[in-house]
UniProtKB/Swiss-Prot annotation:
Its cofactor is Mg(2+). This is Anthranilate phosphoribosyltransferase. The keyword Transport does not apply. The keyword Transmembrane helix does not apply. The gene is trpD. 5-phospho-alpha-D-ribose 1-diphosphate binds at residues 80, 83-84, 88, 90-93, 108-116, 120. InterPro entries: Anthranilate_Pribosyl_Tfrase (IPR005940), Glycosyl_Trfase_fam3 (IPR000312), Glycosyl_Trfase_fam3_N_dom (IPR017459), Glycosyl_Trfase_fam3_N_dom_sf (IPR036320), Nuc_phospho_transferase (IPR035902). Pfam families: Glycos_trans_3N (PF02885), Glycos_transf_3 (PF00591). NCBIfam families: trpD (TIGR01245). Homodimer.
Amino acid sequence: MQQNALLQQLLADNDLSSAEMEACITAIMTGGFSDIAIAAILALLQKKGVKATELSGAYRAMMTHAIPIELDEHAVDTCGTGGDHAGTFNVSTVAAIIANGAGVSIAKHGNRSVTSRCGSADVLEALGYTIDLSPEATMELFSKTRFAFLFAPLYHPSMKAVAHIRRELGIRTIFNTLGPLANPACVKRQVIGVYDPSIMELYIETLMKTGCRHAMVVHGKTESGAPLDESSVCGITHISELHEGVVSYHSVIPEEFGLSRWKTADLKGGDREDNAMIIRRILDGSASQAQIDASIYAAAMACYVSGKATCIDEGLCLCKESLENGDAAKNFSRILDLNREIADKHRTAVN
């Protein structure tokens, strides 16, 4: 579709077909449109509201231009959309670490901070993890640990073409929505936290179209009813679940799983060093019970979608055990050691 025809369609608030959106995103990432047109397209799409058919087309375009990596069909990604401005510590990151200690393969796709003070890449780096390993080095690490962090800029180089436009626009765009879906390992199992409950159905419908096997899209509430882009130990958590093509809906509270209810202030994070310290304390057992509960709650959901647990309750038991017997801490220490060793080896080979 030509640039002007596309703009006219979006100005009229008309939805694009999946193929039209795929062509649109491809043109955006390959220099087919001017910067001014790209800014207009992104803003108009955001105003109109992206539909699942459009998002699946955008997903195909983005994955076509991604650097792929083959890991494990059972690997799980835990991530959030951001945007809740709650200032909590990196719950989805420590949840991935705990779940991995419980035997779950993890392929966490992440980036530096966008809407918070500390993104998953930031906190892992502060913990001593080299985040920009090559795909080959990452595959080697994963083969030994069943843990991989996939640094988004490394696997989606075509996004550089629009980075300056997104920065100047200063608004959320379709690329923010795409982020949690665009794992370069093409994972089929995910826990996605969303700050806006109105997009839960969008994600579920798109995950169905992209071949996901088991996913939970979660939206939490604080004690005051404010949004959280993760499961909540402060209030209710709404869940849209996709499992082998079947969609179901649940609303749960922490007490159902034997967890206490906490205040958002109990989960506050800080900068990368602050959040790294919180994660260390969670792993060594010296963190607050609120921090531990929030972490194992999220980790339990990862265990469930991985197939390691048959329900969230069972996942919670596995994650508690992973923390209490020290498996999560020992396992992550080994990951850091091997990450350092592999990074040094590949750096030496390049030099």
